[in-house]
Structure formats: structure tokens, C-alpha cells
């Protein structure tokens, strides 16, 4: 997510994996056979921030590495603007940050859309963007006049850490009443008849090779899906729900936003080590009018979604089941340095467990919208520290949306949950689909 940039950059600069700077060659783009001919598949690689892939913007085209973000609202590019002026030396500093040069593009134009600013984000205070238009290409599928966000921070760029991407490819759903400032690039391309309405996604983390990801670690299909990776009969569709309370429960941006890929979380169980099943930890909470409100599950494929999601009560129950040991400060530092857990999972304890007993640990079971269960095996929520023989519980205890009695209003469905599933985001029906990956 975009609001996590600053915090993540401070922790990760200098320790990014090699894949962060190496994307498969653009020849890896390919069209996908399916119901819609207007689709293109792109490989993506993982780093400490999330999945990265390449697009081009402008005329002549400038190749930019994008951070995939299902929770952000638009296509954002780092620019040579700040303090309401164009001055790359002032606004980018000397870090070597890659960026989009609007003045090198003959097709770039400013818009009359208002400048927007978010006073409070984890990236930086007063995160400010202008809106322009330009040609955007995903592979060889291009869409002219795409509305995009252009950075215009109210301070020089020297103090902003360098990140290994030039912008954010937001893919949040466009719900009723949202204007062009909330329109992702692929949504605009669909509306213009350049792409289909769907985006397909899969990780190769649980697959035998990277071939289904075109040599990357994940694959995005803009305008369609890769039907060879799932059985359509097993695809379960969930219409999104974006109530007003979601903004504060998920991430309290100012001004608030509620347009996310969500569905009711109606069940959260832990199958105990002695075949004992826990109680249901997806507990309704009291709404503003006193009625019971069902928690929501939020899709988040980025760094903030790392780890299996649990409430505090569920986490404590799991720790008892696996006889977890409170991690030392040194181990916690190793966990953060490795980048295998969400960096906004603050205010939670970390626990180490025996690496030899993983197969005997319980499964985590999640029920979405009252009718489909999904299982996360222990191999996907127990993580080994790369430089030691230590294993730890990789649990996402999201710091927002917690209730005083240890329950949670939201659960982030990230890589631990999604790695064995095919994901379909549908901008036309405002729904998403999940199906088991064909292994």
C-alpha cells in the first residue's frame, strides 16, 4: 500500500533482495487466450514492498517500474514536481530515485482536476498529488489520455528515501459516486474499450516453477484471466461491501476512503493440534446504531498483507496450541529485517516455535460470506529466519480495527491466504473471485 512507503523504506533500504531491481524482460508480456481478446499478461517480482512490474508512460514511452497495489485508488507516478513547481533537482534530490519526466513526453497534459492532499499517511506528511493525462501502455496494449496522479509534495525530495519503483499501479474498485481522481489506469482502459473489465492474479510461490508467472514470482492478467490456472467451476464470486466504518478499521486516511476489495468474514477457526476446533473468532461487533456488524476481509497482496490474519484472541489461542515462546528482541529485529512479515503489524508480540513440528501444527480456516471455507496450512504461517534455525509464527495482527475485547473488525487476506488461490478482480461487477490454483 502507498501509505506504507516511508516506514518500509526506512527499514529496507540497503537490504532489498536482488529481485527488487531485476524484472523479467518486457518480452515476457503476452496476450492471454480467453473470453476477452483484449488482455495482456505481465510478470511481477516480489520485494520488501510488494509486487513490481513494468509499464510505459508518455511519448516517447518512458519505462517505469510500478508497485502493484490493490488498495490504492489511481496510477501514481513520482515526478519532478514539488512545492507547486517543476524542479527535478529540488524535488528528487540526489538519491537516484527513478521518476516520470512529464516534460519529456509530448502527450502529457495537465487537467483541471483539483490537487489532492492526505495530511496523515505513513509515507510522509501532506502527501500531495496533481492530476495529469498521458499515454499508458501495459505491454503493447496502450490507452491514450489516461488520468494519473503526479507527485507534488509541499517540501523538497531529499528527505524521502529512494525506493525501487517509480510509482504505484493502484487497482482499488471504483464504487458509486467516485470521480476520475479514483479511477485506476486499467479501469479507464476498460471504459475506453481497450481492455476487459477483469484483472487476474496468481503467485507462483506454491507452484513447481515460475513458468506460469512468465519467469516472475507472480503474474497479472489485465483485461482477463489465465483459465489454464484454475477451474471456472470452482471460482467463488464475492460482491464487495464498503461501509463507512471500513475507513478507520482498515487504514484511517484523511480524507477517508472505503473503496476496497472486501467481503464479510463470517468464520475464523483454528483446528487444534489434538483435532480440537476453536470457537469462531470472526465475532460481530457493535455498530454505531447498536446493531451487530460482521467483520470484513480485505484483499491486500502487498507487504501489509504478509502473514496469516488473526484477531488477538485467535492469536493467543494458536500460541497456546503450538506452545510458542515469546521472541527475544534480537529475534524480533531479525523478523523485521527479513521482510517476511507485514510492517504495520505493530503492537503485537512475536513467538518462536519448533521448526521440526510444523507438520503437526493446526490449520487456519476462514469462511467468507457464509458459504466458502479456505484453509491456510502451517507451512504457510510458520516462517524460518533465513540466517538461523529459528522459526516464528508469521501472523498478521492488524493494528487498526481492533476491539477492546481482543476481536477484530477487519482481516487482511494477503500472500499467506492467497498463494494457493487464483484471484479475479472484476471492475464491472464490483466483485472478486477466488479459485484453487491448478497445481
Swiss-Prot record:
Keyword list, A-Z: Aspartyl protease, Disulfide bond, Glycoprotein, Hydrolase, Protease, Secreted, Signal
Peptidase A1 domain residues: 51-435
Active-site residues from the entry: 69, 300
Gene Ontology BP terms: proteolysis
GO cellular component, one term: extracellular region
Family: Belongs to the peptidase A1 family.
Pfam family, one: Asp
Signal peptide start-end: 1-20
Superkingdom, natural source: Eukaryota
Alphabetical list of PANTHER family matching this protein: BETA-SITE APP-CLEAVING ENZYME, ISOFORM A-RELATED
Gene Ontology molecular function terms on file: aspartic-type endopeptidase activity
Protein name: Secreted aspartic protease LUC8
InterPro entries on file: Aspartic_peptidase_A1 (IPR001461), Pepsin-like_dom (IPR034164), PEPTIDASE_A1 (IPR033121), Peptidase_aspartic_dom_sf (IPR021109)
Disulfide bond residue pairs: 355-391
Subcellular location: Secreted
Job description of the protein: Secreted aspartic protease; part of the gene cluster that mediates the biosynthesis of the mycotoxin lucilactaene and the lucilactaene-related compound NG-391 that act as cell cycle inhibitors with potent growth inhibitory activity against malarial parasites, moderate growth inhibitory activity against cancer cells, and no activity against bacteria and fungi. Within the cluster, LUC7 and LUC8 encode proteins which are not commonly involved in the biosynthesis of secondary metabolites and are not essential for lucilactaene biosynthesis.
Glycosylation, residue list: 33, 54, 110, 126, 179, 289, 329, 373
EC number: 3.4.23.-
Organism: Fusarium sp
Amino acid at each position: 500500500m502507498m501509505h506504507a512507503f516511508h516506514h518500509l523504506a526506512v527499514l529496507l533500504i540497503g537490504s532489498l533482495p536482488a529481485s527488487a531491481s531485476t524484472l523479467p524482460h518486457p518480452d515476457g508480456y503476452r496476450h492471454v487466450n480467453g473470453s476477452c481478446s483484449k488482455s495482456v499478461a505481465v510478470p511481477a517480482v516480489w520485494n520488501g514492498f510488494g509486487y513490481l512490474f513494468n509499464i510505459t508512460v508518455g511519448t516517447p514511452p518512458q519505462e517505469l517500474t510500478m508497485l502493484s497495489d490493490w488498495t490504492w485508488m489511481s496510477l501514481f507516478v513520482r515526478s519532478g514536481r514539488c512545492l507547486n513547481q517543476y524542479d527535478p533537482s529540488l524535488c528528487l534530490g540526489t538519491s537516484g530515485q527513478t521518476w516520470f519526466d512529464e516534460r519529456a513526453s509530448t502527450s502529457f497534459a495537465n487537467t483541471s482536476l483539483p490537487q489532492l492532499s492526505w495530511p496523515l499517511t505513513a509515507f510522509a506528511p501532506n502527501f500531495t498529488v496533481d492530476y495529469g493525462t498521458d499515454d499508458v501502455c501495459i505491454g503493447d496494449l496502450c490507452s491514450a489520455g489516461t488520468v494519473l496522479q503526479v507527485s507534488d509534495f509541499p517540501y523538497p525530495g531529499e528527505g524521502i528515501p529512494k525506493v525501487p519503483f517509480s510509482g504505484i499501479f493502484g487497482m482499488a474498485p471504483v464504487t458509486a459516486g467516485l470521480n476520475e481522481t479514483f479511477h485506476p489506469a486499467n479501469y479507464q482502459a476498460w471504459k475506453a474499450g481497450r481492455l476487459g473489465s477483469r484483472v487476474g492474479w496468481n503467485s507462483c510461490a506454491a507452484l513447481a516453477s515460475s513458468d506460469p508467472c512468465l519467469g516472475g514470482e507472480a503474474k497479472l492478467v489485465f483485461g482477463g484471466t489465465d483459465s489454464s490456472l484454475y477451474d471456472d467451476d470452482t471460482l467463488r464470486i464475492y460482491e464487495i461491501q464498503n461501509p463507512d466504518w471500513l475507513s478507520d478499521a482498515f487504514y484511517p486516511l484523511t480524507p477517508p476512503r472505503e473503496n476496497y476489495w472486501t467481503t464479510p468474514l463470517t468464520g475464523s477457526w483454528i483446528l487444534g493440534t489434538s483435532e480440537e476446533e476453536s470457537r469462531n473468532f470472526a465475532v460481530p461487533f457493535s455498530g454505531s446504531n447498536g446493531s451487530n456488524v460482521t467483520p470484513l476481509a480485505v484483499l491486500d497482496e502487498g507487504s501489509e498483507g504478509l502473514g496469516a490474519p488473526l484477531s488477538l484472541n485467535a492469536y493467543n489461542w494458536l500460541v497456546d496450541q503450538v506452545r510458542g515462546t515469546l521472541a527475544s528482541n534480537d529475534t524480533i529485529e531479525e523478523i523485521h529485517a527479513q521482510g517476511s512479515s507485514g510492517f504495520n503489524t505493530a503492537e503485537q508480540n512475536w513467538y518462536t516455535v519448533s521448526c521440526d513440528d510444523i507438520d503437526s501444527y493446526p490449520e487456519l480456516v476462514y469462511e467468507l460470506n457464509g458459504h466458502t471455507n479456505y484453509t491456510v496450512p502451517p507451512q504457510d504461517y510458520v516462517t524460518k529466519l533465513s540466517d538461523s534455525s529459528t522459526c516464528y509464527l508469521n501472523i498478521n495482527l492488524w493494528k487498526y480495527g481492533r476491539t477492546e475485547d481482543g476481536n477484530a473488525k477487519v482481516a487482511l487476506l494477503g500472500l499467506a491466504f492467497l498463494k494457493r488461490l487464483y484471484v479475479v478482480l472484476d471492475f464491472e461487477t464490483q466483485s472478486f473471485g477466488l479459485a484453487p490454483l491448478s497445481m
